[in-house]
């Protein structure tokens, strides 16, 4: 770090701005940074590109905020204060929130399937009863109460191949209803993203502290910002890639909706395992 300090004092800081962005990109590719959890979360909720961008930016925002809090707080609290000393506590807090999110995803999927099944069964039975004898009454009576069945069977004729697939179409409509972004609010997405970025980056904290000690506060802030931009590019790319993959799979693979009904279970289990690992790692770091 001595050479780095010398270069800063010589006025060669402009060279480090693009380098900081590149390092942020590479740093985001390292293990961790919640890339696995973000991708699993986007796949589980069948998220849009907009939601993926929001998730990545939220993770970057919290990651940057933690760097500033630790660097500035450490200067005033104790000279022996380091990123390594506070990291286990942040990991433990993150693990608790992540495990709660995994449990919420699992419970939400199970409840959605149970409620969807309860709503579909009487609707299907009544529909088959009235379709043949009271076609006009069906349009009038069920427009409000069983809209999801009306949509899924729209334009079907008795005996057609589409009619035989009506049950599968009803399932597809139910998937779209359950995983529409109205059920997963922007606040929940932001909370998950903010949680994923709580783990601090010792390298970024060290650079910021050096800049502050050299009375180059503006430069330090700029470099941390550039580092965060690079990190955001990686995290957003991961989320957008997951969102596009979900959309393309839904268009090109007829069996995707069947898999999508079970995907949230696997995603919540995967997120839960990551949370457990993070919690154990944080706990072991605390007791050492």
UniProtKB/Swiss-Prot annotation:
Residues 125-144 are annotated as: Disordered. One of its GO terms (molecular function) is monoatomic cation efflux transmembrane transporter activity. Residues 125-137 have a biased composition (Basic residues). Its main location: membrane. Keywords: Cell inner membrane, Cell membrane, Cobalt, Cobalt transport, Ion transport, Membrane, Nickel, Nickel transport, Transmembrane, Transmembrane helix, Transport. It is a multi-pass membrane protein. The chain crosses the membrane at residues 13-33, 52-72, 86-106, 189-209, 224-244, 267-287. Residues 1-12, 73-85, 210-223, 288 are periplasmic. One of its GO terms (biological process) is response to cobalt ion. This is Nickel/cobalt efflux system RcnA. The gene is rcnA.
């Amino acid at each position: 770090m001595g050479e780095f300090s010398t270069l800063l004092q010589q006025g060669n800081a402009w060279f480090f701005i693009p380098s900081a962005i590149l390092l942020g990109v590479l740093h985001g590719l390292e293990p961790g940074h919640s890339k696995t959890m973000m991708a699993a979360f986007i796949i589980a909720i069948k998220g849009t590109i907009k939601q993926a961008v929001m998730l990545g930016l939220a993770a970057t925002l919290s990651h940057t905020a933690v760097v500033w809090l630790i660097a500035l707080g450490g200067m005033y609290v104790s000279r022996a204060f380091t990123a390594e000393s506070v990291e286990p506590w942040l990991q433990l807090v993150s693990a608790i929130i992540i495990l709660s999110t995994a449990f919420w995803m699992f419970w939400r999927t199970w409840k959605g399937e149970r409620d969807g099944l309860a709503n579909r069964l009487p609707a299907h039975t009544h529909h088959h009863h009235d379709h043949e004898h009271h076609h006009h009454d069906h349009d009038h009576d069920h427009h409000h109460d069983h809209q999801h069945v009306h949509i899924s069977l729209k334009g079907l004729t008795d005996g057609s191949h589409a009619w035989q697939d009506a049950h599968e179409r009803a399932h597809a409509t139910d998937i779209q209803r359950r995983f529409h972004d109205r059920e997963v609010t922007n606040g929940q997405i932001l909370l998950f993203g903010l949680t994923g970025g709580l783990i601090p980056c010792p390298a970024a904290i060290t650079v910021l502290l050096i800049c502050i000690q050299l009375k180059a506060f503006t430069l330090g802030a700029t470099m941390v910002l550039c580092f965060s931009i690079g990190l955001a590019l990686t995290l957003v790319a991961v989320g957008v890639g997951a969102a596009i993959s979900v959309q393309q799979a839904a268009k090109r693979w007829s069996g995707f909706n069947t898999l999508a009904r079970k995907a949230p279970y696997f995603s919540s289990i995967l997120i839960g395992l990551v949370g457990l690992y993070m919690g154990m790692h944080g706990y072991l770091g605390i007791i050492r």
